[in-house]
Amino acid sequence: MTLSGKRISKGIGIGEVLCIRKNFDKIISREKIDFSQVDSEISKFNKAKSKAIEALRDLERKAMLQFGDDKKGIFEGQVLIVEDDELDELVIELIVKENYSAAYSIYLAFENLVKSVEDYKDPYLKERASDYKDIRNRLISIILGQVSDFSEINKDIILVTEELTPSDTMQFDLNYVKGFLTAVGGETSHAAILARTMGLPALVMTLSDIDALKDGDKIVIDAMSSIVIKNPSSDEINLYEGKILRQVELEKELFSLKDKDAETKDGTKVFLKANIGTPVDITYVNKYGVEGIGLFRTEFLYMRSLQPPTEDEQFETYKRVIETMEKKGVVTIRTLDVGGDKEIPYLNFKKEENPFLGFRALRMYKEYEELIQAQFNAIFRASHYGKIRVMVPMLTIYEEIETIEYFVNNAKINLKSRGLPFDENLEVGCMIEVPSAALISSKLANKLKFFSIGTNDLTQYVLAVDRGNQKISNLYDKYNPAVLKLIKKVLDDGVSSGIDVSVCGELGGDDAGALLLVGLGFRSLSMIPSATLRIKYLLKKYTIMELEELANKVLNSDSKQETLSYFDKFIGD
């Protein structure tokens, strides 16, 4: 029996199915409790909190031993959420005023938080909902007495679950985990990131296919072909064991490139940087030997608690990342990118019919001046401790330069008045992700020190396509000549003005996309850390002239199919 799925991490794995089921919504009682039970339920909640914090501290230690110091940050963040006073207030209010049980009150308290995050269009932010579900499930399982222990597993397994959370993976000896199958998640999900870090295959499948797999089923995950073979024959097992051996050899070759420069066959240097979303991701940065951070998303700081982060909290986070990256390249910090589709509950954004065209990112800064100024202050304070740059999202019109200058100047005045040191020459740049900004890039280059092109949003704005809409997904094409010509214009304008221009969208970490961008003239790309070794491997196979010829063909392509055929012939496997 063969099942299909969507690949989120390449590779091949063979093992027995081990299912993790979490259907708490189906087993928690919705019945009202008697008034006499209120104190007892509050006590259950408080005891569950204490046990959860104890367990999370233990997971911190395990994570540090298994993955290094930075990985423990996932569980440090979860402890902060469990300890949050506002969570206490929400749960206790539901117990006291609504007379719900502790378990159901916890479920409801997290439900709105989870839904608000799942509504995000940004895939990275959307998938942070798994952290909230992880905490919710832990608290409820403690109250219901359903805490599972998988620490004694000592055979090769494939983890199968509706959604993989950070805690799930820490319950296992990962030497025995050979792959992941989930019903929820994308390329930025915990399952995907962990799988790529470990070099394991992972697929997202339909819930019905997930349910068709039972504990003990022997399966093969072929994430190269995006299939799962249930109960494979001995011939199929032999075939895939051979493929796994060849895969191991290729991995060795890729990791031999870790400390070498990324360059073309004829020696043209290309800087490969990392996109990260939390300090935890520094683990992967170090593993793959990237040359700086091209995009440090800061939204996690605003999502890990039920209240906004303080200036000091942000400063400490930025400082830690900068010091960890010392001598490994510049850290580019993107200021807050929320609004519309990226709602944060305590900011009270109104629902909009067109969130992608609405009140978001730079457009909301003046209305939330105190919040944004605290971030600029924190970034400027951190600039004293290493080489960083600050990048503002979604600049649309030239006049918005004044908004950027307002916060920059206020940060400098504020820090000077407090006697705090900072880098007077801190570079300020912007994301180019709106066509209007791309079209005036020559003018913007006179005011800013660098551009970073966000190809994901730019593509859907240029083509007027919602990439999440399956009915028109065929129109979303990151290789479309109209998109590429606009990207090329921004590069040329930046180079003419003497400023740095890089790409931080998914195009830069895509095999064909990276080669194409270098052919267009880019010498700086930012991507998920695990993509860098593969890109290094590919770059050294081609000369600049060959890549320029490829780019020229794609720029003049008449169809998506024609473009893909060029890539197939050029790259092969």
From Swiss-Prot:
Q: What other comment is given for this protein?
A: The reaction takes place in three steps, mediated by a phosphocarrier histidine residue located on the surface of the central domain. The two first partial reactions are catalyzed at an active site located on the N-terminal domain, and the third partial reaction is catalyzed at an active site located on the C-terminal domain. For catalytic turnover, the central domain swivels from the concave surface of the N-terminal domain to that of the C-terminal domain.
List of residues binding phosphoenolpyruvate: R297, R334, N456, D457, R467
List the active-site residues.
Answer: H190, C504
Determine if Transcription is one of this entry's keywords.
Answer: no
Designated name of the protein? Phosphoenolpyruvate-protein phosphotransferase
Q: Where does Mg(2+) bind?
A: E433, D457
Give Gene Ontology CC terms: cytoplasm
Q: What the protein does?
A: General (non sugar-specific) component of the phosphoenolpyruvate-dependent sugar phosphotransferase system (sugar PTS). This major carbohydrate active-transport system catalyzes the phosphorylation of incoming sugar substrates concomitantly with their translocation across the cell membrane. Enzyme I transfers the phosphoryl group from phosphoenolpyruvate (PEP) to the phosphoryl carrier protein (HPr).
Any notes on this protein's domains?
The N-terminal domain contains the HPr binding site, the central domain the pyrophosphate/phosphate carrier histidine, and the C-terminal domain the pyruvate binding site.
Q: Which UniProt keywords apply?
A: Cytoplasm, Kinase, Magnesium, Metal-binding, Phosphotransferase system, Sugar transport, Transferase, Transport
